[in-house]
């Protein structure tokens, strides 16, 4: 399991390890109905189980139709950085545009995944709350172990800052400063910051649409 979470955690006990999302928690029949609409729902913490599910659904939908948008709906408190990066890399891997929608609560890695949707297709519902902060991890062991873990945490932090900056238009320095403590955004504030492109109230605004392949027709 990833030792890094996008949020504070007790020493040696990362938040994502406090209880990975059981596979049975998600209603399979409901998931199938959403997939028929090309909608992937991340409605839990980001951990190995939920990330594998989301990645698999993105890959399946892309294989079925590589030209039509896929929607990722986010209502998540965040969790494992490495699990979240697996989802991000899969979003970049497939040729489809992936729109994102914040519904309810998008915090930490939930905020990250919301922000990295396809430009122009990142949405938030009016009463959604978005929270950004830095990755963290419990660090312990020998002096050498602590140095290695600290270097790895710094690398992870810089990676998240760089990617977030690329997708929001903010500088990495601004992302680092603003994420030093929990920073909360309303949907409109998230739009102004560059995390989302539009605050929406209608399904017509976020319904998946046919799109060209990123690499050509």
From Swiss-Prot:
Active site: 108, 133
EC category: hydrolase
Annotated GO biological process: protein quality control for misfolded or incompletely synthesized proteins
Catalysis: reaction(s): Hydrolysis of proteins to small peptides in the presence of ATP and magnesium. alpha-casein is the usual test substrate. In the absence of ATP, only oligopeptides shorter than five residues are hydrolyzed (such as succinyl-Leu-Tyr-|-NHMec, and Leu-Tyr-Leu-|-Tyr-Trp, in which cleavage of the -Tyr-|-Leu- and -Tyr-|-Trp bonds also occurs)
A Pfam short name: CLP_protease
UniProt keyword annotation of Acetylation present: no
Major location (coarse): cytoplasm
A GO cellular component annotation in the UniProt record: endopeptidase Clp complex
Subcellular location: Cytoplasm
InterPro entries per record: ClpP, ClpP/crotonase-like_dom_sf, ClpP/TepA, ClpP_His_AS
Region (Disordered): 1-23
An example molecular function term from Gene Ontology annotations: serine-type endopeptidase activity
Keyword annotations of the record: Cytoplasm, Hydrolase, Protease, Serine protease
Low complexity bias (residue ranges): 1-13
EC number from the UniProt entry: 3.4.21.92
HAMAP family: ClpP (MF_00444)
Family statement drawn from the similarity comment of this UniProt entry: Belongs to the peptidase S14 family.
Its job: Cleaves peptides in various proteins in a process that requires ATP hydrolysis. Has a chymotrypsin-like activity. Plays a major role in the degradation of misfolded proteins.
NCBIfam families xref list: PRK00277.1 (NF001368), PRK12553.1 (NF009205)
Subunit details: Fourteen ClpP subunits assemble into 2 heptameric rings which stack back to back to give a disk-like structure with a central cavity, resembling the structure of eukaryotic proteasomes.
Protein name: ATP-dependent Clp protease proteolytic subunit 3
Source organism: Streptomyces coelicolor (strain ATCC BAA-471 / A3(2) / M145)
């Amino acid at each position: 399991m990833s030792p890094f979470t996008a949020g504070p955690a007790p020493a040696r006990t990362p938040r994502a390890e406090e209880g990975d999302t059981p596979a049975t928690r998600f209603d399979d029949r409901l998931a199938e109905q959403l997939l028929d609409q090309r909608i992937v729902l991340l409605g839990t913490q980001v951990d190995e189980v939920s990330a594998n599910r989301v990645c698999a659904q993105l890959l399946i939908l892309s294989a079925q139709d590589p030209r039509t948008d896929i929607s990722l709906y986010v209502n998540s408190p965040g969790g494992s950085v490495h699990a979240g990066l697996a989802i991000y890399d899969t979003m970049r891997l497939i040729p489809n545009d992936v729109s994102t929608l914040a519904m309810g609560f998008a915090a930490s890695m939930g905020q990250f995944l919301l922000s990295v949707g396809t430009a122009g297709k990142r949405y938030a519902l009016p009463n959604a709350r978005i929270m950004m902060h830095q990755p963290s991890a419990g660090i312990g062991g020998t002096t050498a172990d602590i140095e290695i873990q600290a270097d790895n945490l710094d690398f992870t932090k810089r990676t998240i800052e760089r990617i977030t900056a690329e997708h929001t238009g903010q500088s990495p320095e601004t992302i680092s400063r603003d994420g030093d403590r929990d920073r909360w955004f309303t949907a409109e504030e998230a739009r102004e910051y560059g995390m989302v492109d539009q605050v929406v109230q209608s399904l017509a605004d976020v319904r998946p649409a046919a799109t060209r392949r990123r690499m050509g027709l």
